[in-house]
Amino acid sequence: MQVILLDKVAHLGSVGDQVTVKSGFARNFLIPQGKAVMATAANIAHFEARRAELEAKAAEALAAAQARAAKIAEIAAVSVSATAGDDGRLFGSISAKDIADALTAAGVAVAKSEVRLGEGPLRTTGEHEVKVHLHPEVNAAVTVNVVAE
């Protein structure tokens, strides 16, 4: 199925690209999320009329993500406390939601879906490097210091 992308989609393309995707991916994800429209003659003409508006919106989103990444770089580290045993292992774990809440409390609004924990939830005390994926082109890193209560 041919679609026109209205937003940058990872591993697929950027604003305005006409791409061929599987029908289910288009019908169940791209079109309902507002990331694409079917590539009909009417939609192509409508898109060309709105191209500048959509590109400006994409540039604005990129600038906002870069500003948030700069704020995260200023913070550099956040501290999260949890109950732990004598050997440093936590009773439970620190999830992406806990890290997002700590970053939001530090002054940068971050959603839990933007926090990337490469090896799953944090289960030990100490410092851990965590990546924050703010935009397809913007990533930031923050150090999470897990402290025992």
UniProtKB/Swiss-Prot annotation:
Keywords: Ribonucleoprotein, Ribosomal protein, RNA-binding, rRNA-binding. Pfam families: Ribosomal_L9_C (PF03948), Ribosomal_L9_N (PF01281). One of its GO terms (biological process) is translation. GO terms for cellular component: ribonucleoprotein complex; ribosome. Transmembrane segments: none annotated. It comes from the Bacteria. GO terms for molecular function: rRNA binding; structural constituent of ribosome. NCBIfam families: L9. Binds to the 23S rRNA. HAMAP family: Ribosomal_bL9. Belongs to the bacterial ribosomal protein bL9 family. PANTHER family: 50S RIBOSOMAL PROTEIN L9. This is Large ribosomal subunit protein bL9. It comes from Actinobacillus pleuropneumoniae serotype 3 (strain JL03).
